[in-house]
Curated annotation (Swiss-Prot):
Pathway: Amino-acid biosynthesis; L-tryptophan biosynthesis; L-tryptophan from chorismate: step 5/5. NCBIfam families: trpA. It comes from Escherichia coli O1:K1 / APEC. Belongs to the TrpA family. The gene is trpA. This is Tryptophan synthase alpha chain.
Length: 268
C-alpha cells in the first residue's frame, strides 16, 4: 500500500503524473505475459494494473474479454496468476501492483484468504469491479487487515455522498471513470473531470487516476491538466497484444513504442 504513497511523492517532486498500463495476466501465455510486463515497466510505466482472467467480465469491452479468452486458452488459472505476481514483485520491488477483478474470484478463495494471498505475493491494491461502495465493507476490511489498498471507482455522475464515501474508504489511488459503460479505446475519454477532482481533493481522497478510453498522449495530458494524478490505459494496450499475437518480438516493440509517448505526456 505504501508503494503508492512513495510513487506519488516522487512524481510530485519530478512534476510528473503517473502512467499506468493495464493487461490481463497470462495473456497470451505465462511466459510472454511476463515479457510484456517487463517491457511496460522498461518503457516507463509507473505502476501496473493487472487483471486475473475470469469467465464473466461484466465491465470489460470486447478487447479485454478477448484477452481473458486467450489466457484461458493458454490454461492460465488464478493460482498461476499469483505465482506470476510473486515473480513480478521479486523482479520489480518498488513498482505499485494493482489488481482489477471481480467478486467471484475473491469469494472462490474466501475473502480473507484472498487478501492474505495478495499480501504474501506483494500486491498493493485491489479494485473489485462489481462491488459497489455500499456493499464493500467485508472486502475493504479484509484488504486493510492485509495491508492492501481497497480501490474504488468514482463515476462521472458521482454525487456528494458517494464522493465522501470513496474518499473515506479508498486507499492507494481513486479510479476516476472517464465515462459510464464498458472499457474500450474506441470510446475516447470525453469531458474534463475538474469538478470531481476538486471534490475528491477537498475530501482528502486517494490521488485520482483517470481510466476508461485512454488511448493517446493528448488524453493523458488532459487528465493531468484536469487535476488527475495520472492516467490508466487498458484496451489500447491489450489491442496491441492482439494485433501482434503471432509475432512476440514485434509485440514487445509495439508496446514500448506506445508506452513511451504516453509516459512522456505525464511530464509538465
Amino acid at each position: 500500500m505504501e508503494r503508492y504513497e512513495s510513487l506519488f511523492t516522487q512524481l510530485k517532486e519530478r512534476k510528473e503524473g503517473a502512467f499506468v498500463p493495464f493487461v490481463t495476466l497470462g495473456d497470451p501465455g505465462i511466459e510472454q505475459s511476463l515479457k510484456i510486463i517487463d517491457t511496460l515497466i522498461e518503457a516507463g510505466a509507473d505502476a501496473l494494473e493487472l487483471g486475473i482472467p475470469f469467465s464473466d467480465p461484466l465491465a470489460d469491452g470486447p478487447t479485454i474479454q478477448n484477452a481473458t479468452l486467450r489466457a484461458f486458452a493458454a490454461g492460465v488459472t488464478p493460482a498461476q496468476c499469483f505465482e506470476v505476481l510473486a515473480l513480478i514483485r521479486q523482479k520489480h520491488p518498488t513498482i505499485p501492483i494493482g489488481l482489477l477483478m471481480y467478486a467471484n474470484l475473491v469469494f472462490n478463495k474466501g475473502i480473507d484468504e484472498f487478501y492474505a494471498e495478495c499480501e504474501k505475493v506483494g500486491v498493493d491494491s485491489v479494485l473489485v469491479a462489481d462491488v459497489p461502495v455500499e456493499e464493500s465493507a467485508p472486502f475493504r476490511q479484509a484488504a486493510l487487515r492485509h495491508n492492501v489498498a481497497p480501490i474504488f471507482i468514482c463515476p462521472p455522475n458521482a454525487d456528494d455522498d458517494l464522493l465522501r464515501q470513496i474518499a473515506s474508504y479508498g486507499r492507494g489511488y481513486t479510479y476516476l471513470l472517464s465515462r459510464a459503460g464498458v472499457t474500450g479505446a474506441e470510446n475516447r475519454a470525453a469531458l474534463p473531470l475538474n469538478h470531481l477532482v476538486a471534490k475528491l481533493k477537498e475530501y482528502n481522497a486517494a490521488p485520482p487516476l483517470q481510466g476508461f478510453g485512454i488511448s493517446a498522449p493528448d488524453q493523458v495530458k488532459a487528465a493531468i491538466d484536469a487535476g488527475a494524478a495520472g492516467a490508466i490505459s487498458g484496451s489500447a494496450i491489450v489491442k496491441i497484444i492482439e494485433q501482434h499475437i503471432n509475432e512476440p518480438e514485434k509485440m514487445l516493440a509495439a508496446l514500448k513504442a506506445f508506452v513511451q509517448p504516453m509516459k512522456a505526456a505525464t511530464r509538465s
